[in-house]
Amino acid sequence: MSTSFPEGWYEPDEELHRQEMVEELQEEVGEGHVLKGLNVRLVARYRGTDDALFALDDGRIAQVHLTWSDEMETDPRFPATSVFPRFEAWLSFWNSL
């Protein structure tokens, strides 16, 4: 995804970092979570936080606050996730904050 992000968001340069973030998300997502079983790709991180943007295969974007709990979450509300139909919808939401 080649795009410009709002201030504070950045696109990680290293493939290893992107893969590690995807693996962390997959480890945390438990049964009933909106992202369980979906393929995702890291597109951006928010500096100084545990927030990340993931692209889904169908074009949707998920903003996720990772827990870094070292285990699968049992509550499907975690990691906290908001899913948007496309990047522009997320951007509009973010800019309204």
Feature-to-residue mapping (PLM):
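Charged interaction scaffolds used for protein-protein
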Residues: 3, 7-12, 24, 53, ...
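Helix-rich interaction surfaces within compact, conserved domain-sized segments
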Residues: 61-97
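Negatively charged, low-complexity tracts enriched in Asp/Glu with abundant Ser/Thr
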Residues: 2-38
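Intrinsically disordered, low-complexity regions enriched in small/polar residues
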Residues: 7, 11-12, 48, 56, ...
